[in-house]
Each structure stands twice: as C-alpha cells, then as structure tokens.
Amino acid sequence: METSTVNAVGVWFYSINTQRYLYLLRNDPRHPNTWGLPGGKIENNETLVEAMTRECHEELGFMPEYLRMVPLEKFTSADKGFAYHTFFCSVGKEFIPTLNEEHIGYSWITTGVWPKPMHPGLWSTVNFDAV
C-alpha cells in the first residue's frame, strides 16, 4: 500500500540591519511552547512559494518583503510520509508580526544564540555552519 507524503514549508527570516533571526513561540498541542518558524502544510496544488506566502499571511499577518530567498533544506522523514521545505529569506529590517492563535510570542535573536526550547525539527536545520 502506497502512502502519500505530507508536504510542509517554513521560512527563516533574517534581518540585515540587526543581523538577527525571527523565531515564533508555538501554541499547539504538538511541541507546545517551543520556538519554531512560520510555516505549515502545503494545501491542494500550491507551489512552495505560494504555501510559504499563505502561511506568513496567516501566522505573521502579512508576507514581509524579502530581499533574497534561498531554499535552505528539504527534510524527509524516514518513512517518507512527511517532507518539510525550509527557506531562508533576508529582509532589510525587523518587523513586528501580528500573530494568530498558532503562536504566543516572537523574538528576533542574534546569530549563534538559540532560543530554548527549540522545536526538535528546527534544531537540525539551524545547527550547521552554512547559515
């Protein structure tokens, strides 16, 4: 029996003027009170960028104008049932998100300083020298 893959997308925003990254504090039953990124499940026939834009509108209140967007990573679960696409987006300056019910806080954090507790899936993404 073949199973379909659930695809999701997330975006890691970086402010050029402050050299800090945006993290959101999760408010959901899976991994509650952990720091993560804006993002979520890709719906219907959305492209990755369309899903990323929609998720930002839902979770941040708008899609920030980015200067550069780079695909950072595609994580696929061992059973191939889940794939998460992470993008890096640089913005000129920090912004204040209008959070929806999925998050209870946000923080812009300096490079190399990690918010705790971090969502377990995010740690492997951000913990490498290329970023």
Predicted feature residues:
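Conserved Nudix-box catalytic region and its N-terminal flanking loop in Nudix hydrolases
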Residues: N17-E59
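Short, structurally constrained coil/turn elements
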Residues: H31, M63-E65, E102
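Conserved N-terminal beta-strand and adjoining loop/helix that marks the start
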Residues: M1-L22
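Catalytic phosphate/metal-binding cores of nucleic-acid and nucleotide-processing enzymes, i.e., regions
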Residues: M1, S15, T34, E50-T53, ...
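Short strand-loop junctions, especially beta-strand C-caps/beta-turns
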Residues: G40, T111-G112, P117
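A short coil-to-beta-strand element that immediately follows conserved catalytic motifs
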Residues: M63-E73
